[in-house]
From Swiss-Prot:
GO cellular component entries: mitochondrial outer membrane translocase complex
Record keyword RNA-binding present: no
Protein name per UniProt: Mitochondrial import receptor subunit TOM7-1
Principal place of residence: mitochondrion
Membrane-topology annotation of the record: Single-pass membrane protein
Subcellular location: Mitochondrion outer membrane
Transmembrane segments: 42-59
Topological domains, Cytoplasmic: 2-41
Species of the source: Solanum tuberosum
Length: 72
């Protein structure tokens, strides 16, 4: 790695440390976003049908469970 020349050598070293911290935070945010998306996908996959049944059972007129589950 090349060393910076001139009076700003300490400032350049501090900037390198800041860039490292920003990179770590960026990586953390990316991993957290991926984890959140995976969990949301699973929740949506297993929760959609029960949600539809619950909404249907609370509607007026109240249908029977067989009417909710039948495609017709």
């Amino acid at each position: 790695m090349l060393k910076p020349k001139g009076k700003n050598t300490k400032k350049a070293a501090a900037a390198d440390e800041d860039d490292g911290a920003v990179a770590v935070v960026g990586k953390f945010v990316k991993e957290w976003g991926t984890w959140t998306a995976k969990k949301a996908k699973v929740i949506t996959h297993y929760g959609f049908i029960p949600l539809v049944i619950i909404i249907g059972m609370n509607s007026e007129p109240k249908p029977s469970l067989s009417q909710l589950l039948s495609p017709v």
